Amino acid sequence: MKLSCLSLALAIILLLAIVHSPNMEVKALAGPEADAIGFADAFGEADAFGEADAFGEADAFGEADAFGEADAKRSKSSSKTKPKKPKKPKKKIKIPDWVKSGGKMVGEAVAGAVADAAVSAVMDAAVGTTAEPEQ
């Protein structure tokens, strides 16, 4: 049997990856939602507790942001400041369903191809046949 231990280990690793691959989730396809603890999401929007977001804007409780600027409640005492323009609401990015389903189909196709390769490697290891170039 001329099958190396490296190819057998690779076949086992691929088989384990296929077994555990349905439990994995692609974060890029997940929407920009806050997590269960309430931290800011990936797009920097404030969480459920009103804390400052990743871009340093003031929270709902009137605290200063990360850049040291006071919010509207505290800046009223200064008469030299210019009135701030109202900010536009941030748009949430909506990923179309056809993109999500297409990514799922591609993932399943890749997992199927890897599964076929792993099964053939395991079968070759069990039977003891390997493809050798003819001389």
UniProtKB/Swiss-Prot annotation:
UniProt KW Secreted keyword: yes
Residues of the signal peptide: 1-21
Protein name as catalogued: U-myrmeciitoxin(01)-Mg7a
Main localization category: secreted
Lineage: Eukaryota, Metazoa, Ecdysozoa, Arthropoda, Hexapoda
Keywords carried by this UniProt record: Glycoprotein, Membrane, Neurotoxin, Secreted, Signal, Target cell membrane, Target membrane, Toxin
Functional note: Neurotoxin that triggers pain behavior and inflammation in mammals, and is paralytic and lethal to insects. Causes a time-dependent increase in cell leak current. May act by targeting membranes.
Proregion positions: 22-72
Sugar attachment sites: S120, T129, T130
Start and end residues of each stretch annotated as Disordered: 69-95
Misc remark: Very highly expressed in the venom apparatus (5%).
Chain intervals with Basic residues compositional bias: 75-93
Pfam families assigned: Pilosulin
Record family assignment: Belongs to the formicidae venom precursor-01 superfamily.
Tissue specificity of this protein: Expressed by the venom gland.
GO cellular component: extracellular region
InterPro entries attached to this UniProt entry: Pilosulin
Description of post-translational modifications: Glycosylation is critical to maintaining the aqueous solubility of this protein, but does not directly contribute to its activity.
Cellular localisation: Secreted; Target cell membrane
Keyword check for Glycoprotein: yes
